[in-house]
Every structure is written in C-alpha cells, then in structure tokens.
Amino acid sequence: MKRVLIVDDAATVRMYHRGILESAGYIVEEAWNGIEALEKILNAPFDFYIVDINMPRLDGYGFLRELRQQVVPQAPAIMVSTEAAAMDEAAAYRAGANAYLIKPVLPLQLLSFLSLMLGEASQ
C-alpha cells in the first residue's frame, strides 16, 4: 500500500484529504507544518506528498526544497493552495512540485493525480 503525507496547517483540510485517500486504500499520515513533515520523513519517506503553501515555521515552498535537496528528490508532490495566482503556481514548480491544485480539491481530481504520478491503474 502506498503511503501519503498530508502537510497542511488546517485540520479540516487534512481531515478532508485523509477521508478521500483512505477510502481509496492509501495509508495516510499528517503533519501541520514543514518542520513536522521533515521529522516524519526521517523515520520513513513517503510515496507521495500533498503540501499546502502557507504554514507556520516552514512553509510549503521551503518544505519542498528540503525534500528535493536532501531527503527524497524523486517522490511526487502536489502543492495545494487557495491562491490561484500564476506567480504562486510558478513558485510551487520552482520549489519542486509536480502539480499545483487550487483548494478545495475535488476527490476525483486528487485521486487521478495520485494515480497518474504513482503510475497506478485508475482508482
């Protein structure tokens, strides 16, 4: 089973994404900021990351840069945000995101991206 880490400071968003992913058979863990996420990854890297941009202590951009440079450079990551600005999307890709989705992310959209990026058959 694939392991997914949700990195978001909003508990309601983490619960929403967790419900979608667990119902599709993924193993899900959560972190409320980039620092906590990096600590979790040191124990065992994940197969996929869903990362918010605006978080305390270490934002999504900083987390993705650390992930790519030092931990697991090849693991797919989706950055999610309420911001639809092109400059935020460009910054997400520069930081190492494989995709940029606007919140709220639809269940089918999220599962399709995961399936595609993990090379799985349709969920």
Regions from the PLM with identified roles:
Residues 44-50:
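Active-site beta3 strand of CheY-like receiver
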Residues 55:
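Receiver (REC) domain active-site loop signature in two-component systems and cognate sites
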Residues 105-114:
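C-terminal output helix
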Residues 25-32, 40:
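Short hydrophobic/Thr-rich beta-strand motif most characteristic of the beta2 strand and flanking loop
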